[in-house]
């Protein structure tokens, strides 16, 4: 074959995009006494008290279950159920006073941990928890303590919202048990909040990436939204005592401050947020092996939605929203969606794999991860539509 023919073949061949392993995800650090001593500064006492309380509650959770199991066999864990777990939020108000809804509420009460929270992925339409039965489903293994008390997958928040709807239909003494469980659940969230306003994914703390401030899957945003509604004492939350409402308001305000403090500045310009931020330093961190340090478009969009709901936003909030919306506009892909992750420096899409490798093209990661994770999202589109109206009101 002639040199000219080879050149023609090469010219006709489809272009192959440049692909490379950009690096490897470094697992985030848990919250420890050593880190508090070296990194907490003037807030050291508050952080140590937080860690001590977390450990005490964890020990109490485990001791309670162990006591129930002493001296005999115990039931298997409840089956796994994803989604809303049988706790619908869109039924007519009267439905929440029916026997069907009350059974769900009774299931919720029975699975509430001694610390006041709930695990995830339990079928709330199923039987109530039996003595000695685990607080979580088989999802993490028969004896696993993973996610015993969490805000992941909207756990705890969904249970609290459901209890509020049920008690609203039972204003007399028969609804008191649900109101008491609700108050314990809100107290759980208040206990879980870090001194700087952040929230971990799991509480009491279990270490690893779970200790990071978790924006992933809107966990943080969902907590703050609920706390703001509790603080307002309207509708289903009108029963909330004034003192608890005041604490919820203060917690929500503190959470807003940490949102503003964690917005990523790249090249002197505010952008979006990462899925997780270190509890102490607020620096961006990774999570699971395939979730690197990167700007997260969906989570950033949800945080912007939360900030835009604030009445009379401060100049700092307005600046954060303007910058975040501008970043989403700049990073939209030609097809009209967004990559889930963007490199903080280059603003190019990045993709992670289970071996912690970070890639610049989805084709380079394993088939299992390509098909088993949502690498492209559309959530920012809704946020930008909201932003257009929100910004117009300030003109």
Regions found by a protein language model. Name each.
Residues 5-15:
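Bacterial N-terminal signal peptides
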Residues 20-98, 229, 233-254, 280-287, ...:
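Terminal, non-catalytic domain-edge segments
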Residues 62-65, 69-71, 118, 123-125, ...:
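Intrinsic, low-complexity N-terminal interaction/targeting segments
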Residues 96-100, 150-161, 214-225, 247, ...:
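Aromatic- and histidine-enriched alpha-helix N-cap/loop-to-helix transition segments
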Residues 104-117, 181-198, 249-268, 320-336:
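Long, well-ordered core segments of solenoidal/helical folds
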């Amino acid at each position: 074959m002639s040199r000219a023919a080879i050149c023609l073949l090469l010219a006709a061949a489809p272009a192959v995009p440049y692909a490379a392993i950009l690096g490897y995800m470094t697992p985030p650090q848990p919250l420890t006494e050593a880190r508090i001593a070296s990194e907490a500064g003037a807030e050291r006492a508050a952080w140590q008290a937080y860690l001590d309380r977390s450990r005490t509650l964890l020990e109490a959770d485990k001791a309670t279950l162990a006591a129930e199991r002493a001296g005999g066999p115990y039931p298997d864990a409840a089956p796994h159920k994803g989604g809303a777990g049988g706790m619908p939020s869109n039924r007519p108000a009267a439905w929440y006073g029916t026997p069907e809804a009350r059974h769900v509420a009774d299931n919720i009460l029975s699975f509430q941990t001694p610390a006041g929270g709930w695990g995830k992925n339990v079928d709330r339409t199923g039987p109530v928890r039996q003595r000695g039965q685990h607080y979580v489903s088989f999802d993490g293994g028969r004896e696993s303590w993973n996610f015993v008390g969490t805000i992941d997958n909207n756990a705890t928040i969904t249970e609290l919202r459901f209890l509020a709807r049920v008690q609203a239909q039972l204003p007399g003494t028969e609804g008191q048990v649900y109101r008491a469980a609700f108050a314990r659940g809100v107290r759980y969230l208040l206990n879980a909040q870090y001194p700087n306003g952040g929230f971990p994914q799991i509480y009491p703390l279990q270490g690893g990436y779970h200790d990071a401030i978790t924006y992933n899957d809107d966990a943080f945003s969902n907590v703050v939204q609920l706390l703001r509604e509790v603080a307002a004492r309207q509708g289903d939350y009108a029963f909330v005592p004034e003192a608890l409402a005041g604490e919820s308001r203060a917690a929500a305000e503190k959470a807003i401050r940490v949102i503003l403090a964690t917005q990523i500045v790249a090249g002197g310009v505010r952008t979006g947020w990462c899925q997780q931020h270190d509890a102490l330093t607020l620096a961006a961190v990774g999570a699971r092996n395939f979730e690197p340090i990167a700007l997260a478009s969906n989570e950033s969009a949800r945080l912007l939605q939360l900030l835009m709901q604030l009445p009379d936003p401060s100049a700092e909030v307005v600046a954060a929203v303007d910058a975040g919306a501008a970043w989403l506009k700049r990073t939209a892909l030609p097809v009209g969606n967004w990559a889930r992750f963007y490199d903080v420096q280059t603003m190019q899409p990045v993709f992670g794999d289970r071996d912690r490798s970070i890639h610049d093209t989805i084709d380079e990661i394993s088939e299992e991860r390509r098909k088993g994770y949502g690498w492209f999202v559309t959530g920012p589109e809704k946020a930008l539509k909201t932003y257009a109206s929100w910004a117009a009101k300030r003109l």
